[in-house]
Swiss-Prot record:
<dbReference type="GO" id="GO:0005737">
    <property type="term" value="C:cytoplasm"/>
</dbReference>
<feature type="binding site">
    <location>
        <position position="171"/>
    </location>
    <ligand>
        <name>3-phosphoshikimate</name>
    </ligand>
</feature>
<feature type="binding site">
    <location>
        <position position="26"/>
    </location>
    <ligand>
        <name>3-phosphoshikimate</name>
    </ligand>
</feature>
<feature type="binding site">
    <location>
        <position position="200"/>
    </location>
    <ligand>
        <name>3-phosphoshikimate</name>
    </ligand>
</feature>
<keyword id="KW-0028">Amino-acid biosynthesis</keyword>
<dbReference type="InterPro" id="IPR001986">
    <property type="entry name" value="Enolpyruvate_Tfrase_dom"/>
</dbReference>
<feature type="binding site">
    <location>
        <position position="27"/>
    </location>
    <ligand>
        <name>3-phosphoshikimate</name>
    </ligand>
</feature>
<dbReference type="InterPro" id="IPR036968">
    <property type="entry name" value="Enolpyruvate_Tfrase_sf"/>
</dbReference>
<keyword id="KW-0963">Cytoplasm</keyword>
<feature type="binding site">
    <location>
        <position position="344"/>
    </location>
    <ligand>
        <name>3-phosphoshikimate</name>
    </ligand>
</feature>
<dbReference type="GO" id="GO:0009423">
    <property type="term" value="P:chorismate biosynthetic process"/>
</dbReference>
<feature type="binding site">
    <location>
        <position position="414"/>
    </location>
    <ligand>
        <name>phosphoenolpyruvate</name>
    </ligand>
</feature>
<dbReference type="GO" id="GO:0003866">
    <property type="term" value="F:3-phosphoshikimate 1-carboxyvinyltransferase activity"/>
</dbReference>
<dbReference type="InterPro" id="IPR006264">
    <property type="entry name" value="EPSP_synthase"/>
</dbReference>
<feature type="binding site">
    <location>
        <position position="389"/>
    </location>
    <ligand>
        <name>phosphoenolpyruvate</name>
    </ligand>
</feature>
<keyword id="KW-0057">Aromatic amino acid biosynthesis</keyword>
<feature type="binding site">
    <location>
        <position position="172"/>
    </location>
    <ligand>
        <name>3-phosphoshikimate</name>
    </ligand>
</feature>
Length: 446
């Protein structure tokens, strides 16, 4: 890739001991931005602790293209105020980049405008699934030109709403994208999922929870069916949690090195899949300690393979695959329920298999996942495929395999700005007695 140099992943032969603070949740930030935009007719909304990354800045840019104002505080760029009116200029164009949330959450908003809005993005984004969402909007009476990027939404100022059947087995974002705008449709919205099980279901639960927080009535009592009643979306203050999925590479450093890493600001109760993350880490012999405002993982001196269904948390698959590849030699791990990752930023299953095998590991694709047999690996180039989670997986492996060079580490800016510096700080700020402190013993548990 022109202009992109490889990043020498730092290695350590000793346990990692560190305290890390990760920025806000991308998923929660972009949902809050969308809900604040839809609530602008009711008043201004404030978002505190917002993630500022490529994906969230693309969302901000998209909403500004649609006529909204998203203003950052002079003192804190993570403190945002959303106001204004949905009034895109003629021939407005939204850049989706490689952000699935922009690609799938913003077209329904554009349909509520009175202009034609064109959507495009990075070259890799053109292969990401979008047809189920566009077909769903067409069922609701929206005029759309195209079946993939670039496409144009011809807004008329209103969307009638009603019932739509879609196959969301390729991405939960098809459901979330429609749900977020559904209350603004004249008759509200009923979504019926018709395909295989929906992946990343906790993300739909996050959408429903945030809609309810904004005063929207949502009925999700029946499996694979969601009903959003028509009505105002309330302007309010949103407080964004730390991004727990982005904490996993740092917690993985504790697992693979036998050290202890503490994440500050870990929520006591979360709308993210916190419990699933902790179960995975415990399954890799990590000891989990929770306090009132942190989470700490203590790695063991050794750990074996794991058999885990990642359907609900597919975004964790690259990190889990990296930990599996570094397990005790001969250990076998099975990562299941992640066939949908073939349609993410890249085909993550093929990418993980290629990269792990390329440095001497053993990784085989299955119909819905990966089988990884831990073997001694060697240094080499780890390609990121412009995928932030592939890049962080390479960093995890590099901790224990000297000579790993990650191609295009800058792609981590998609959701985790300054990742290389955060990673270096983690390794540079060793704290050997984390587990001995009084706060670390507040609420021990697994």
């Amino acid at each position: 890739m022109v202009g992109v140099s490889n990043w020498a992943a730092p290695s350590t032969a000793t346990p990692v001991h560190a305290t890390v603070t990760v920025p806000g949740s991308k998923s929660q930030t972009n949902r809050a931005l969308v809900l604040a935009a839809l609530a602008a007719r009711e008043g201004s909304s404030r978002i505190s602790g917002a993630l500022r990354s490529r994906d969230t800045d693309l969302m901000i840019g998209a909403l500004e293209t649609l006529g909204l104002s998203v203003a950052a505080s002079d003192s804190d760029p993570a403190d945002l105020t959303v106001s204004g009116t949905l009034a895109p200029a003629a021939e407005a164009r939204v850049d989706c980049g490689l952000a699935g949330t922009v690609l799938r959450f913003v077209p329904p908003i554009a349909a509520l405008s009175a202009q034609t809005v064109t959507f495009d993005g990075d070259e890799q984004a053109r292969s990401r699934p979008i047809a189920p969402l566009l077909d769903g909007l067409r069922t609701l009476g929206v005029d759309i030109d195209g079946d993939g990027l670039p496409f144009a939404v011809r807004g008329t100022g209103t969307v009638a709403g009603g019932t739509v059947e879609i196959d969301a087995s390729g991405s939960s974002q098809f459901v979330s994208g429609l749900l977020l705008s559904g209350a603004a449709f004249t008759d509200g919205l009923t979504i019926v999922h018709t395909g295989d099980s929906v992946p990343s279901a906790p993300h739909i639960a996050m959408t429903v929870s945030m809609l309810r927080d904004a005063g929207v009535e949502v009925d999700d009592s029946a499996p694979d069916r969601w009903r959003v009643s028509p009505g105002p979306i309330g302007a309010r203050d949103w407080v964004i949690e730390p991004d727990l999925s982005n904490s996993v590479p740092f917690l993985a450093a504790a697992v693979v090195s036998g050290g202890a890493v503490r994440i500050t600001g870990w929520p006591t109760v979360s709308i993210q899949p916190a419990d699933t993350i902790l179960k995975i880490l415990a399954g890799l012999n990590g000891e989990v300690r929770k306090g009132s405002s942190y989470l700490e993982v203590q790695g063991a001196t050794n750990y074996g393979g794991i058999d885990v269904d990642l359907r609900d948390v597919g975004e964790l698959a690259p990190s889990v695959a990296a930990m599996a590849a570094l397990a005790d030699p001969g250990s076998v791990s099975r990562l299941r329920g992640i066939a949908h990752l073939r349609g993410h930023e890249t085909d993550r299953l093929a990418a993980l298999s290629t990269e792990i095998n390329g440095i001497g590991g053993q990784c085989e694709e299955t119909e819905d996942g990966l089988v990884i047999t831990a073997r001694e690996m060697h240094g080499g180039t780890w390609s990121s495929y412009a995928d932030h989670r592939m890049a962080t997986a390479g960093a995890i492996i590099g901790l224990r395999v000297p000579g790993i060079e990650v191609e295009d580490i800058g792609t981590t800016a998609k959701t985790l700005p300054d990742f290389p510096q955060l990673w270096a700080d983690m390794l540079g700020g060793q704290t050997d007695d984390l587990q001995q402190g009084p706060s670390a013993r507040e609420t021990p548990g697994r």
